[in-house]
């Protein structure tokens, strides 16, 4: 059976609720005007911190704000950093630093300093004994300018100390590593195709990436740095450290005639003659010699 629903207009509903809303608003206004606070406010005041609690008020006027930027007038980020300074009249540069100043002190040792002196790598001051207190790092750079870009072709010369993989003694290794950096005034954006040239591009007569880079396609994307025209210098110490890290090998030897360690007692055969261990005649396939018979 169908029962019709009564229809009430919005105006009628508001008229019915208006007396109730008026009573609640008057009660709230009276509570606010009364001198006696509500019970919940009194409870909140009782739980407040006591007056004898130790507090410190910070005076913001006595705090010096931190500088937003580093002073551009500094000669270099740190002492011994390799920093290229823009100069249109200079085409060749020489830098002298040390492994310690470049953050590679773990690769420096008295053996590396002695080998560097033998190779004629000298840089910095000498100590009281006439020896170098740090391992020198010499960097030579040739500058080529081309269409708002600077190409730095250089060589890093130093000596690092590695562990001999035969006897585990210090093994100084001379480093002569070439590097190339490309400094561009425009932001460096890596191509999405990573230099891939498709056959249809050649058929359409499009310019290849090699022609677009004008002979700089041999420089890796990680070696291309943004050097705005307004900047006067750029720090390339990170790339020098990376070049030295790439020269670390696992097959370094202290001497081509190194005898290594005894496989039985572990004695260094280069410095001891008391090892009496006899070499064992190991026949690798002797247990399997009769398998195919």
From Swiss-Prot:
<keyword id="KW-0690">Ribosome biogenesis</keyword>
<dbReference type="Pfam" id="PF02620">
    <property type="entry name" value="YceD"/>
</dbReference>
<dbReference type="InterPro" id="IPR003772">
    <property type="entry name" value="YceD"/>
</dbReference>
<keyword id="KW-0150">Chloroplast</keyword>
<keyword id="KW-0934">Plastid</keyword>
<comment type="function">
    <text>Plays a role in synthesis, processing and/or stability of 23S rRNA. Required for embryogenesis. May be involved in RPL23 transcript levels regulation in non-photosynthetic plastids.</text>
</comment>
<dbReference type="GO" id="GO:0042254">
    <property type="term" value="P:ribosome biogenesis"/>
</dbReference>
<protein>
    <recommendedName>
        <fullName>Large ribosomal RNA subunit accumulation protein YCED homolog 1, chloroplastic</fullName>
    </recommendedName>
</protein>
<dbReference type="GO" id="GO:0009507">
    <property type="term" value="C:chloroplast"/>
</dbReference>
<keyword id="KW-0809">Transit peptide</keyword>
<comment type="similarity">
    <text>Belongs to the DUF177 domain family.</text>
</comment>
<feature type="transit peptide" description="Chloroplast">
    <location>
        <begin position="1"/>
        <end position="42"/>
    </location>
</feature>
């Amino acid at each position: 059976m169908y029962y019709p629903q009564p229809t009430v207009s919005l105006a009628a509903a508001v008229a019915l609720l208006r007396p109730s809303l008026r009573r609640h608003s008057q009660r709230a206004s009276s509570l606010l005007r009364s001198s006696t606070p509500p019970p919940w406010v009194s409870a909140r005041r009782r739980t407040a911190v006591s007056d004898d609690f130790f507090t410190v008020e910070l005076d913001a006027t006595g705090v010096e704000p931190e500088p937003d930027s580093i002073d551009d007038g500094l000669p270099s980020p740190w002492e011994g950093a390799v920093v290229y300074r823009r100069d249109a009249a200079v085409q060749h540069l020489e830098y002298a630093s040390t492994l310690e100043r470049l953050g590679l002190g773990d690769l420096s040792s008295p053996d590396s300093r002695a080998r560097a002196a033998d190779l004629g790598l000298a840089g910095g001051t000498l100590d009281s004994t006439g020896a170098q207190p740090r391992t020198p790092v010499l960097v030579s750079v040739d500058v080529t300018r081309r269409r708002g870009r600077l190409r730095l072709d250089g060589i890093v010369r130093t000596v690092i100390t590695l562990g001999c993989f035969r006897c585990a003694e210090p093994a100084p290794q001379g480093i002569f590593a070439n590097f190339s950096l490309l400094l561009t005034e425009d932001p460096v954006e890596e191509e999405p195709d990573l230099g891939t040239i498709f056959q249809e591009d050649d058929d359409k007569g499009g310019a290849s990436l090699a022609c677009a880079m004008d002979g700089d396609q041999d420089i890796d994307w990680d070696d291309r740095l943004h050097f705005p025209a307004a900047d006067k210098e750029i720090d390339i110490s990170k790339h020098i450290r990376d070049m030295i890290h790439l020269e670390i090998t696992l097959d370094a030897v202290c001497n081509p005639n190194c005898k290594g360690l005894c496989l039985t007692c572990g004695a260094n055969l280069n410095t001891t003659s008391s090892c009496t261990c006899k070499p064992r005649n190991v026949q690798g396939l002797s247990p399997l010699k009769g398998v195919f018979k």
